[in-house]
Amino acid sequence: MDNDQYLKNMQTLFASEFAFYLKAANFHWNVEGSDFYEFHLLFERIYNEVFESVDIFAEELRALKSYAPASLGILNELSIIMGQDQIPQPASMAQELLVDSDNLAELFRQGFDLAEQMGDHGLSNFLADRQDAHKKHSWMLRSTLK
C-alpha cells in the first residue's frame, strides 16, 4: 500500500470516529423518556471518552504530515458512520450506537493491520486501544439493551 492510500484510510477512520462522537453527543443532548437518566449518562460516558481520542487521533495524523479532516462536508464524505437527523427512542439510540461501535471496532482492527504493515507501531498501538474502547462501548450498550 502506498503512503497516500494509507493516509486516506486513516482519515476515514478519523472521520468515522468524529461522526460517532457527534452522534453520541446528539443522543446525550436529546434523549427523552422514562429511562432518560440511564441513557443520558451512558451516552455522556461514551461521547466524553471518544472526544478525548479524536484530539489524539488528529495529532497522530499531523505527525504523519497529513491534515485531520475538519470540515463537516469532508468528515461526512469520509465517514462510514451515518448521521442521525431524527430523535429516536432511547433504546433505538443505543441500538444505533451499538451497531456503529461494532463497525468501528472492526474498522480500527483493519486500521491496526494497515499501520503494522506500514511499520507505524505508535499509531498501531493507538488504533488497538481504540478497537478495545469500542468493544467496551459495545458491551455496555448491548448489556443496557437486555
Map each language-model feature to its residues.
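Acidic/histidine-rich alpha-helical segments that form the ligand environment
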Residues: 9, 55, 59, 76-128
